[in-house]
């Protein structure tokens, strides 16, 4: 059954420069800048678009300057390959490298098509304290149906003496090493994707805190694996385990974790990325070794990032009904434009999985 979701009033009170959506009818052209930066990552990415009236369009080019603690750390423009793809997706990714860690202050300045925007000062949060991560295959049984899932457990400890906010996601990585009988070198190809996370009051009260309260009867009616939407991130606060330990328990459908299902995709990627078969003849590899792993990522984030991700996840949820539900305000923090950018600090554990 549909439950009326009461979304936290904090969304309306979040201390940001603006909010999304804004009055499209009266707004002139503004840069839309979105993305998350990751402490310690080799490459950072933000997406740039142009919003005017009720439409969003791509930009021809964009330049991003990144300042860390007041010092220019990187200047980058969009790659030519990204420009070609941006014409279809109406957002242009700009990639750059910059090094920052806990406590550093990051500011981005963005220029595109004659428009300018910037972020406020973004303080890099602490990395979550994660002691142990584990997983096992199991079956979730309900009244009339069952589902094979990969069940994850994450043991972590809250940082003492402060309010903390977190985000959680999975990254599946399938790697294929292709060999050819004509003697050409082996080619490794990697596919990364973000499986949906599911949980209920039957598994984890921390991740469910502030979401819909579902019973087993509700889960029989709704789609268990998708009822919380298909957003990339789950979010949670330390409200239920402040200054102490916690164990997160969540599931992901086993259908995402069969490497054989990815082999055809990997070969298509091989053709597109490396020009194999560009002469009209596609030599099928004599062998391909497929390996599968999943990375569990727990991110430390700001309160604003927590509210932003929670809002996006809520409006994409199968349980969200704009007629029956309180309206959701999506925070924004871009100065001179719209959108949201913030910094995450990640604790990650990669787990190798069997092929079947």
Where would I find each of the regions flagged by the language model?
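Sec-dependent signal peptide hydrophobic core
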Residues: 5-9
